[in-house]
Amino acid sequence: RHNPILLTDGYKPSHHKQYPPEVTHTFAFLESRGGPFDQTTFFGLQYLLKAYLAELTITLEDVDEAYAFFAEYFQNPTIFNREGWEYIVREHAGKLPLEVRAVPEGQRIPIKNALLTVTNTDPKVPWLPGYFEPLFVQLWYPISVATQSRAMKDIILANLQETGTPELIPYKLHDFGLRGVSSIETAQIGGAAHLLNLGIFEYPPQRREPAAQPAHGAGRNKQHDQQQHHARHGQLNAA
């Protein structure tokens, strides 16, 4: 089990001292500022929340552990917000008073738009949304994988539609990420993000008639007949 209080950057525990006393709420958001694609595919939030935040309860033992850690880290026992975390344990039974809103997972969103927002629901903990910023930024990885995988799928699917076998799209872009990432968990997260695009062809899946002939090995002079066949079966423009 992870101690949620330790899932942050080293300097974050000092930020509670920097908010003006009249501040009661803060509002944080995550967006894609830009990149090679004009849209991002949002994915990974549900796993992050369930694994690290929503289903965990902060205990006094967690607070004691974090206090000891940051007292040594800062060489100062007064930096860590022990009072604030004990308040969460006492008044919220260890549950984080945060409200997280997000676009639906799997949805493509134009860049420079908010993908998720985080705010505190208790006016006594305005420092809390920013405290977990580093954890929410972990979403960069599943979002990046899902976005790039979707872009690759679009390119492959366009060519499959031209050559007559778009129903083969689930088998045209394979995931070999396990051997190239830093941990088993990273591979699981990246694999799930890729599976979002290529694991199932349609939502919900629909039964299709098999193609009359395979596309592989067909020359350009055979493509017209194949396209006519699939157009008659409603497969040419499948997405």
Language model segments and positions:
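An acidic, glycine-rich surface segment that forms the CoA-thioester-binding/catalytic face
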Residues: 69, 74-78, 82-89, 93-99
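Buried, small/hydrophobic-residue-enriched core segments of structured protein domains
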Residues: 1-36, 88-97, 106-109, 115-239
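Exposed alpha-helical structural elements
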Residues: 44-48, 52, 62-69, 83-87, ...
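Outer-membrane beta-barrel transmembrane strands
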Residues: 102-103
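Low-complexity, highly charged intrinsically disordered N-terminal segments
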Residues: 26-81
